[in-house]
């Protein structure tokens, strides 16, 4: 048994029960974005959160322990994503990455945007030309240290 097995079980039960990530997150007491990332194997849950997820998804004690193991983050099955939605993000970074970097450096100086001290919010906005996906990424700016 490993973390991937638990992720597969969570997805299987979610589909079978017709659950929504937002409802799961509400029970865990965290954002839907963070809980979804965790359930998909990208975050570490604490004991209390793992217990709640165990109740929701029918996970036994050993399976709940796997939710508390630090995962190998950013582990996609291929170097270049093949899923169309994930590929669009890859494409956006390829097209706009240098622009984002330039504008962040112009505003903040030489450094990076943290993906650790970070939050994300995904919302739907109605639009007569087709609903829009709004994604807000908020990461702490970390300047490079001079030494």
Predicted regions and their residues:
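Helix-turn-helix/homeodomain-like alpha-helical modules used for DNA recognition
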Residues: 63-143
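Long, hydrophobic N-terminal alpha-helical segment
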Residues: 1-65
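Short, charged, solvent-exposed linker or helix-capping segments at domain edges/interfaces
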Residues: 145-147
């Amino acid at each position: 048994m490993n973390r991937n097995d638990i992720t597969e079980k969570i997805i299987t039960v979610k589909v079978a029960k017709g659950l929504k990530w937002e409802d799961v997150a509400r029970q865990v007491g965290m954002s839907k974005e963070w809980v979804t990332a965790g359930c998909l194997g990208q975050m570490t849950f604490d004991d209390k959160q793992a217990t709640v997820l165990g109740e929701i998804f029918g996970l036994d004690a050993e399976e709940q322990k796997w939710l508390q193991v630090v995962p190998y983050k950013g582990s996609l099955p291929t170097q270049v994503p093949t899923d169309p939605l994930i590929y669009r993000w890859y494409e956006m970074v390829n097209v706009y990455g240098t622009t984002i970097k330039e504008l962040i450096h112009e505003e903040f100086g030489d450094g990076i945007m943290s993906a650790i001290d970070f939050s994300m919010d995904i919302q739907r906005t109605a639009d007569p030309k087709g609903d829009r996906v709004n994604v807000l990424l908020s990461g702490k700016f970390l300047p490079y240290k001079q030494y």
